Amino acid sequence: MPAIELTSIPYTTANGLQVQRLVIALTTLDKLVNPEDLKRLEWKSRPQPGIGVILDGRAPNWVFAALAPLCLPFNVPWIATYEPRLHAAVIVHCNDPGLQPGDLVDLGKSIPQPSESRECLLNVKDVAARNSVHYQRLAIFVPEGVNTAVLKDLTLPLNLDLTRGVVLWGKAPVWLYTRLTLLARNAPWVGTYNKPLASFVIVAGQSAPGASLGDAFHLVTGPACPAILIGGPPNSGKSVLANALAIGLKRKFGPEIHMQRAHADGEGDWFVQMYANVDLQARAMELRHAAKAKYTDRFFLHHAAAVQNARETSRLVLVDFGGVPNNEDVTLLHRCTHYILISSRDDALPEWHNFCTNRGGLQCLAVIHSTLDAKLEILQRTPYLELIAGPWHRGEDKLPNESIEVVIEHASALGISV
């Protein structure tokens, strides 16, 4: 069975607009897909001409970037990508004079965007791949709180050479990646870089020898940075801590802090941001349930490779470690260098210390005894930070400053420049 199934479904929006949702379904139990799966897409039903298309589903950005150009031959008046954080669809391509890129298709109770829209920065530079070829990179720098209105006047840099292939690079919303792919589609090929793959994936273009849809090219990477595993028993606040650490570290270090969510819960950045809005919490839980995966033999192998690749292209990697310690997890464990534990149960800590220290050889940075109370009590600072802290609730991006500071102190000691 193909790993990616596509189904066009008629849909009527809250204001009566007739559209079609192109639903992206990942058919694998673990919800993992590989670039070569783009070569075996299965269309259960295809888009109908004359009706706008909304790309909808949970998939890597390179899947969305590949699907938008594939919809063009169906003569649809516009293409949009579903943005769960707005509960709306963002127009990324249109032939309708009444619409333009960046406009929103309201799906009912859409969420207001920031009133001021800051421009995205695009920078052209060559990068080397492991096959010794130099590729043209279009780096994307997205300001915090970016508005979809940036698409209205978005153009490619004048020094971008469309007689060469283009690699899109950087952390950006799916709608921005998809729009840039469409703008650059007249190049011989367009690729989107994926940090966990340490590769770029061919998603569009006019075809070129040796570069077809779904091909992946590994780029030259640097020395491996530290990777901090964040572990502990269920219902202790592990994912809340991981997200808060990522937010705090990115604000201090910059965007080259990578979060690898090595669990099957179906939560991503989108879930955390949606759950922070009370109006989107129910929808967030629906999408989380739909994206929830099952653990398979390749699950931890996949995430182990992703952590190793991310370590070679980041300044620091955080690993939100799902489940409980078992033999299958050791491969992923050995890709990490340090660990932080958070637990609401003291009796669970010895098992986790044994797993991380004795089996993984990792260095402990901190132990947090989580509580539902608003509390911060430092128990010790050496040989690792130990504290009682809380509460840890979804939808909040704040945590005790000491927890951020200990990571910063150790990161500095490990040679990570700030």
Briefly describe each language-model feature range.
Residues 1-52, 58, 63-163, 176-226:
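Long, low-complexity, Lys/Arg-enriched
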Residues 54, 167, 228-231:
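Short hydrophobic/aromatic beta-strand immediately N-terminal to the Walker A/P-loop
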Residues 58, 171, 233:
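P-loop (Walker A) phosphate-binding loop of NTP-binding proteins
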Residues 228-247:
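Glycine-rich phosphate-binding P-loop
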Residues 251-270:
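Short beta-strand-centered segment that lines the nucleotide-binding/catalytic pocket of NTP-utilizing
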Residues 271-291:
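Conserved NTP-binding/hydrolysis module of P-loop NTPases
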Residues 291, 309-327:
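Switch II (G3) loop of P-loop NTPases
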Residues 322-402:
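Conserved catalytic-core segment of NTP-binding enzymes
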